[in-house]
């Protein structure tokens, strides 16, 4: 870096924009290659600023040579492939392998060469995260080719590697194919048509006749089978002896007698004679292959001609008649057992089926019984809190009664109005009387409470003494009882607490209404006479609708204007301690003001501590070392 001046750095930055390149290190060097002779270095004529760069676009490392003598920009670059190895042959000469040959870098300054070597060998420390996670890095093509050559690939068509691979697909069973072909042509003669006609007739005869019919032609096979074996040895002479083979036909009747004896014995042994012939008929019709499967019978079919074609079908019953008797009983037994066995399984299936319904009925009954029992108490439980809604619905009624009370007083029906008031505010009066007992003490200490006291004590006085100030009481009652009835509706048990808390504020309001900043009770007494006029004004205000009266009553219940405090306006314009610290102002005046008031003392100390911590933090400056060369680039 000592060889590069500011102008050279500007050229490098223009050639390697910061948006797409992260320059890790730069030095001055020359490029040499060992080509075409691997044992001799050749100067390429390229020299300039050699930069180790992390490409932010491709997320790979590059060695790029920038022209600093001219304006050609990047004149050479080499991507650092996978497992890139960087060697130091000399302190001033470093080498690495490229695809075609080796390359060498000749450095001007040895210190810069050693520094550049460390950066290249530990390049992962300065790499971008995406570069480290890049799995698509390029490998050296030369090494890839060598690895591919060293590996033997056995593909599906690897004939070059295995010369005799196709020979394994050659079949040696060619001799069997012509034999089957020689045996196949004889069947085509026109006898096939007669065979079809005779076969159909034989099937009709078999279906029409009883068990005796299939037994008569049955013995034809035994004599035919030995002759067929003799003919197989001389297949060419099988055609002329056909007329001679018809002669042994009378011999089978000698053998027919025992099968005839067997035939009637079978129906006698089997109680069901009809299914027996049906079974061999179906087997003979469905399975004609057992005869042609052996080659002897297949060859005999053309030689024997029609009589053999008529007899293979009944031959099945001969062979099948002997094993057939056992199958029918098996089928009958299986059928009987099948009919009987599936019959019992349904009942067990039906057996478990009924239990679910009883469970369901039982559960339904239990649920109904339990639900009915549970719903009843729930209904009763829900009916328990139901009473509160009536008082909510009856909220307008007390207002109406309260508005009707003055008329009743004017009509001299005070006893009736008294009853309604006692019914509406029966729970609240006790706490009101207690607060009224407190109010005379306050008034006795202050003096001149004569006018306001009857206004405050009109609620209990009406409960005790009816003939007190007819016009004011209804208004005061409307104001005092409305807030009581409003909270009393939702929760009856809390009525005494709410009513006990509600009445005290009105005296406080009457005593503190003229006051603007005095919280304690003693100052109001001298200003009490003014409450008569304010009380008159309040009576004029309460003659409006019930909602406004309720709002005024709630304000009075909260303490009224007396609950407000005076604040020094000089402190409103002053910012907090943190703002003063941020602006650089001294925090001593507000701290002193905060200490002057008892509630402002603790927050002032906390604010001072926080401000001091912020100031200490500002003074601390973390020094970031960019590995001794990162700030320049």
Swiss-Prot record:
Chain positions with Phosphothreonine modification: 334
Biased composition (Polar residues): 363-376, 399-414, 454-465
PTM sites of type Phosphoserine: 337, 588
Protein name: Proline-rich protein LAS17
Compositionally skewed regions (Pro residues) per UniProt: 216-225, 238-256, 342-357
GO biological-process terms attached to the record: actin cortical patch localization; actin filament organization; actin filament polymerization; actin nucleation; positive regulation of actin filament bundle assembly; positive regulation of Arp2/3 complex-mediated actin nucleation; regulation of actin filament polymerization; regulation of Arp2/3 complex-mediated actin nucleation
Region span, Disordered: 145-545, 563-606
Domain spans labelled WH2: 547-567
Domain annotation WH1: ranges: 16-127
Gene3D superfamilies: Pleckstrin-homology domain (PH domain)/Phosphotyrosine-binding domain (PTB)
Low complexity biased stretches: 192-215, 257-269, 307-322, 479-488
Miscellaneous section: Present with 8580 molecules/cell in log phase SD medium.
UniProt-recorded Gene Ontology molecular function terms: actin binding; Arp2/3 complex binding; small GTPase binding
Entry's Gene Ontology cellular component terms: actin cortical patch; cytoplasm; mating projection tip; SLAC complex
UniProt subunit comment: Interacts with KRE6, LSB3, LSB5 and YSC84.
Keywords: Phosphoprotein
Name of the gene: LAS17
Biological source species: Saccharomyces cerevisiae (strain ATCC 204508 / S288c)
Taxonomic placement: Eukaryota, Fungi, Dikarya, Ascomycota, Saccharomycotina
